[in-house]
């Protein structure tokens, strides 16, 4: 079972936040896009191609997406990837390079910078929160 994590030493709980609140809106086309993004995280995704895939102009797509979710499509995608990476980081046997590729990035250092910018923690620091503590003695 997953535990709810609260880090009392932090002013922000952003590292442990979730993207699920951004799913409650009335735009069915954007809900379909969100489902598609969740299924294709490991792929290289360009926003203009995504708009075309869902039969919208890039401008209309970005406007509708932001109106529905409160985020730009790129920021939403990045946050979705960070959320997936968090789940994978909770598995101690998964290497960071493998996780980076699994969420659609090739460059581990670029992904680490994004992860830190979104959570306030490095991937390693985030992972350490879920490792069993060893008794000191």
Region spans (language model):
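Basic, amphipathic alpha-helical hairpins
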Residues: 11-14, 29-46, 65-69, 86-95, ...
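Short hydrophobic/aromatic patches on the structural cores and recognition surfaces of FHA
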Residues: 61, 85, 111
């Amino acid at each position: 079972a997953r535990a709810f994590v609260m880090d009392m030493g932090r002013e922000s709980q952003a590292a442990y936040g979730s993207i699920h609140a951004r799913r409650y809106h009335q735009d069915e086309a954007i809900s379909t896009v969100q489902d598609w993004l969740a299924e294709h995280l490991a792929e290289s995704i360009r926003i203009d191609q995504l708009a075309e895939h869902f039969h919208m102009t890039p401008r209309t797509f970005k406007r509708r997406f932001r109106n529905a979710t409160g985020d730009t499509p790129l920021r939403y995608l990045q946050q979705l990837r960070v959320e997936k990476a968090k789940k994978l980081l909770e598995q101690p046997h998964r290497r960071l390079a493998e996780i980076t590729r699994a969420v659609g990035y090739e460059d581990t250092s670029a992904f680490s910078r994004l992860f830190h910018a979104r959570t306030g923690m490095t991937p390693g620091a985030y992972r350490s929160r879920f490792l069993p503590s060893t008794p000191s003695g």
